[in-house]
């Protein structure tokens, strides 16, 4: 198939990062160019990101936890009027507080669905209920779990999909965003062995390089990696 020539030359992506436990906020502009001198289109894409929630879903001013209800409202206000948006999480989400553990993460999954999360990767604590339950929680949350470096014994991906691709159209021009996720292989040693029995946690850096190249080859203009790692220097 003949690859279509890009019609736009500038993309602006605003990244809002929420530290749901600490209540930290930030906005980061990111630009990409195709080298053309005309036909510029600016896409206003807003991304809401959380990580290490550890089932702290209730607002707690004393411990500086904003809670899922407040997060949902802030995210809705922030993304209103944008050309497109994504809500992403980097794991350690479904486990850590009685409100979650008593129902094996279902309460958190339902709140994630209500907030409108699009995708997440996994942290070691997300495997605490076992691998099958983690898949179930992804379904309850209606969120794509992206940890493509985690494989079954036959080499196929454990989760249903390795990537999320979102297309945003404006003024007849399309921006294609690809999202993938990686989880630290060391996670296999950070949970009960039976929770991850039969799974192969492959090298995160090697997988990330391959998947980023794949998404670019598929025409993605922006590639986002979600990672949960104990070694940020080698994954960043």
Segments predicted by a language model, with ranges:
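Acidic, metal/ion-coordinating pockets
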Residues: 33-236
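Sec-dependent N-terminal signal peptides of Gram-positive bacterial secreted proteins and lipoproteins
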Residues: 8-30
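N-terminal secretory signal peptides that target proteins for export/translocation
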Residues: 1-7
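N-terminal targeting leaders that route proteins to membranes or the secretory/organellar pathways
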Residues: 5, 29-36
